[in-house]
C-alpha cells in the first residue's frame, strides 16, 4: 500500500479552501446576464467557449492533491444542482464558496464546527420553506418563455422556441435538442406516436414522390410474434378486404411467404397493406406494443395470453385516423383508443418512472408517456460554426431543464432577489447556543452572495445594490441587464423555485461537510525512479573501440 500524506486541522482546511476558491472563482465569472465567457482547452479540436457553470467546473483538476479535494467537493455541488434541476450550477457554487469561507473563519475563531453545521442546516430548512411561500405557479407561455430566456443567458429566441414547443406537445411531451444544419433555430413537432421502425418492403410505398406510405383510417394488427405463414393471416385479411380499409401490421417480424403474399396483394390492389417491425426488444417491445394497443383501441395478439392469429377478428384490431411510414420511422396520428384507458396506461407508466433506478430506464419510460399523452418536439439549434453550435446547444438544454423545473414547482423573483427576501424573513431565527447562531448568520449572509456576484460581473458596486434591494420589498430587485431597479417578475426576470431551492440545499450540504473536516489524507506523490549511476561491470566495454 502506498504511503499517505496526512494533514490536520487548520493546515488541512487552508489547503481545501484554496482549492474551493480556484474552482469557484473560475465558475462565478459566468453568473448573470453580463457574466463572462470561459475558454476551455481541449486535447484535440478547437477550444470550447462556454458560460455554463457546470461545464467549467467539470474541466478543473488541480495539481496539489489537498487543494484538488476541495475543488472536487465543490464540483459535486454544481453537478448535483445540475442533475436535480438542470440549472443553477453557478448559483450553487457561489453559495457553497460563501458558506465555506465564512464557516471556516468561524472555525478558526474557535467555534464548534458541528454546531456551526447545525445552525447552517437550520437556516437552510427555514429558507426553503420561505422560498415555497414566495413561489408563484408558472403555467402560461409568457412566463415559460421568460424562464427559458434567463436560463439561456438572456437569449430571447431560445425562450420563445421552448415555450412554443411546450405549447404544442404539452407539459408531458418530450422535447429534445439536436444540432441543426442551418444558421436558424428550428422547431419540428411530431404529433401522435412515432417509433423508429420503417416499412419492411419498399413495394408497400404508395407515395413515390416522398418515398413513404400513407394509410387513411387503417386497421392496425398488433402481433407479438414472427409471421412467416400467410395461412394464419387469411381470415383477418379477408375481413379487412371486405371492410375496404387499409391494414398496418406491427409484428416482431413479417418474413418469407407471408411478406411476399402481402406485397403481391398490395401491388394488385386487392388489399392495401403495410408491415413494420414492432419497436424495442424483449420486455420493452411487449410494453410498447401494449402502449400502441391502448392508443389505437386494439388488442395485442400474443400466444402467451391464448390469442391466435387465425381467430383474430376486426374487433381485435386497432384503428387510427392516419398513419405515415417511411424507411426509418412510423407515425400513428390520432389513434382511436378510449381516453380513460390511455390515462390509466399513462398513470401506470408514471408509477414505473417513480420506481425506476437507472436514468436510462427513466428516460425511456418518459418517452413512452410523451408518446401516449402529448407528442414529441425537436429543437434544432442553428449556428455559424461548430464552436458556437456546441455552446448554444448546451445553453438550450439548460434552458429546457429550467423551464421544466419552473412548470413543476413554480417561479420566484430572479437575480438573487428571492434568496435575499427569504433571508430577511429569518432575521429572528435562533439556534440552541451561540455557535449555532453564528452558523445561521453564515447561511443568511451567503444567501446575498448570488446577487452580489451578478452585480460585480456587470461592473457595479455590490454593497450599494445589495443594500438598495434589501431596503425594498416583495419582488423589488436589480435588473443587471438594463442596470435598473424594479419588480423582477414584471420585468420577466424569473428563476424556477426548484433551481434556487436545489442550489441552496446542495451548497449547504457540501459546505457543512467541509466545515466539519478535521483531517485530510492523500497519496504521497511517487518519487522519481532511483538513479542507477554508471551500471557496474560495463567499464570493460570501452576496449570495444577496436572492433571497428
Curated annotation (Swiss-Prot):
Gene3D superfamilies: GroEL (3.50.7.10), GroEL-like equatorial domain (1.10.560.10), TCP-1-like chaperonin intermediate domain (3.30.260.10). Its EC number is 5.6.1.7. Keywords: ATP-binding, Chaperone, Cytoplasm, Isomerase, Nucleotide-binding. It holds the Pfam family Cpn60_TCP1. SUPFAM superfamilies: GroEL apical domain-like, GroEL equatorial domain-like, GroEL-intermediate domain like. One of its GO terms (cellular component) is cytoplasm. ATP binds at residues 30-33, 51, 87-91, 415, 479-481, 495. The gene is groEL. HAMAP family: CH60. InterPro entries: Chaperonin_Cpn60_CS, Cpn60/GroEL, Cpn60/GroEL/TCP-1, GroEL-like_apical_dom_sf, GROEL-like_equatorial_sf, TCP-1-like_intermed_sf. It is found in: Cytoplasm. GO terms for molecular function: ATP binding; ATP-dependent protein folding chaperone; isomerase activity; unfolded protein binding. It catalyses: ATP + H2O + a folded polypeptide = ADP + phosphate + an unfolded polypeptide. CDD domains: GroEL (cd03344). Together with its co-chaperonin GroES, plays an essential role in assisting protein folding. The GroEL-GroES system forms a nano-cage that allows encapsulation of the non-native substrate proteins and provides a physical environment optimized to promote and accelerate protein folding. Belongs to the chaperonin (HSP60) family. PANTHER family: 60 KDA HEAT SHOCK PROTEIN, MITOCHONDRIAL. It comes from the Bacteria. Its main location: cytoplasm. Forms a cylinder of 14 subunits composed of two heptameric rings stacked back-to-back. Interacts with the co-chaperonin GroES. GO terms for biological process: protein refolding. This is Chaperonin GroEL.
